[in-house]
Amino acid sequence: MHPPGFRNFLLLVSSLLFIGLSAAPQSFLPSLRSLSGAPCRLSRAESERRCRAPGQPPGSALCHDRGRCECGVCICHVTEPGTYFGPLCECHEWICETYDGKTCAGHGNCDCGKCKCDVGWSGEACQYPTKCDLTKKISNQMCKNSQDVICSNAGTCHCGRCKCDNSDGHGLIYGKFCECDDRECIDDETEEVCGGHGKCYCGNCYCEAGWHGDKCEFQCDITPWESKRRCTSPDGKVCSNRGTCVCGECSCHDVDPTGDWGDIHGDTCECDERDCRAVYDRYSDDFCSGHGQCNCGRCDCRAGWYGKKCEHPRNCPLSAEESTKKCQGSSDLPCSGRGRCECGRCTCYPPGDSRVYGKTCECDDRRCEDLDGVVCGGHGMCSCGRCVCEKGWFGKLCQHLRKCNMTEEQSRSLCESADGTLCSGKGSCHCGKCICSGEEWYISGEFCDCDDRDCDKHDGLICTGNGICSCGNCECWDGWNGNACEIWLGTEYP
């Protein structure tokens, strides 16, 4: 039995312990825990205060309503296409501006959807150097689009980089050369982008299923499945891979310059009349070598002629295979794709043009001419389609002077492309001009930045042999038209 004094001592200790627990902060309560799972040492009020934006009163949204608060730390929700982030989940725009395929142009860091530029760079994508060492001429040259227009007439050039005109603040004009104008996608009546039924990319609307039109303004009265069924050709391809299906009807890619149907036609674009054109018969409006009729891409030959394209006379002592082989020579195409083969003999086209000659029409002196018609730059002579340059000149068209009065530094500054690479890494620099690699015949352009393989082909020939490839686009010779210079618009040859 304990004395009364001991009992009083126990009562005093119990009272003090009760008071202490009552006054203890809620951080010791098991309801709040830290990220490690240990009890949180913050009160609930303090934890929530740390998860609110500065200046927000108690009871307002925690973590901007984009996450949960755990012991004063915001755990942000995962969203599409990325995640909310930031100390208070305040950042949603996680993608920063890009320039030439690089985030913040490679000259800054992406912070909460905005570029923080390195010293010496500015702009929404850190694409503009604050100090420019380029001359105005070089700067403007670097700002020209493929049509040689500075910033597509939709912006201004700053040190070789385009700054697009977006005074309205909507940013609808963009692109490396300000070539994209999304204002073209806005419906004039509703003022909605693509009528609210599609997405805009570089000034073109891509409509949702069931809608069509330049601005997705027309609704299709049949289901997408039925539309696709009507457009499917017998070989199971939508519009035979030669057109676009719009509400159950095929719009074939080929357009005849006269306004009638073009070489590609049919309900599902299944007919390609180009299959009736022999590579050595491109210079006439007649199909099937002029000796038959073309029916949906197949030749029906007249009497006395045979072959896939009615190219072989029946009275020829040679077989069709022997005739074609004699006309090919070292080329993969009969008459090098520049003439007509009949019974093993080539007739070069166009008739009367002395620039195309040879037993198999292998020589084409038009290749020695520049776009202005000057032969070998005026500094050489043409021999079977190749320039033989005068002393002191070199290059494919004798366009480069061997003697140079520039310093190496001056020369290099003129050869650097927009990203600072010398001749795009595909050539060497001589006197301020890029000499593109001879091993890669398809590399061209002022800065060796063009790939001539991108030019359209027909019959296996770049620009159909009726023009030259200039930075990915065909520049057709007189009388020819079309993306691949495959359409003859001149007078018929006899």
Swiss-Prot record:
* IV repeat windows: 185-230
X repeat start-end pairs: 455-494
The residues bearing each VII repeat, given as ranges, are 327-367
Q: Which cysteines are joined by disulfide bonds?
A: C40-C71, C51-C69, C63-C74, C76-C89, C91-C112, C96-C110, C104-C115, C117-C126, C132-C159, C143-C157, C151-C162, C164-C178, C180-C202, C185-C200, C194-C205, C207-C216, C220-C247, C231-C245, C239-C250, C252-C269, C271-C296, C276-C294, C288-C299, C301-C310, C316-C343, C327-C341, C335-C346, C348-C361, C363-C384, C368-C382, C376-C387, C389-C398, C404-C431, C415-C429, C423-C434, C436-C448, C450-C471, C455-C469, C463-C474, C476-C485
Q: Where are the V repeats?
A: 231-275
Glycosylation sites per record: N405
Q: Where are the III repeats?
A: 143-184
Region annotated Cysteine-rich tandem repeats, chain positions: 51-494
The chain positions of domain I-EGF read 40-90, 91-127, 132-179, 180-217, 220-270, 271-311, 316-362, 363-399, 404-449, 450-486
Q: Where do the IX repeats start and stop?
A: 415-454
Which Gene3D superfamilies did the record assign? Laminin
As given in the record, the signal peptide range reads 1-23
Localization of this protein: Secreted
Question: Would the keyword Endoplasmic reticulum turn up in this protein's UniProt record?
Answer: no
Q: Report if keyword Signal is assigned.
A: yes
**Start-end of the II repeats?**
96-142
State the Pfam families in the record: EGF_2 (PF07974), EGF_integrin (PF23105)
Keywords recorded for this protein, A-Z: Disulfide bond, EGF-like domain, Glycoprotein, Repeat, Secreted, Signal
Q: Where are the I repeats?
A: 51-95
Where do the VI repeats start and stop?
276-326
At which residues are the VIII repeats? 368-414
Q: What is this protein called?
A: Integrin beta-like protein 1
- What gene codes for this chain? Itgbl1
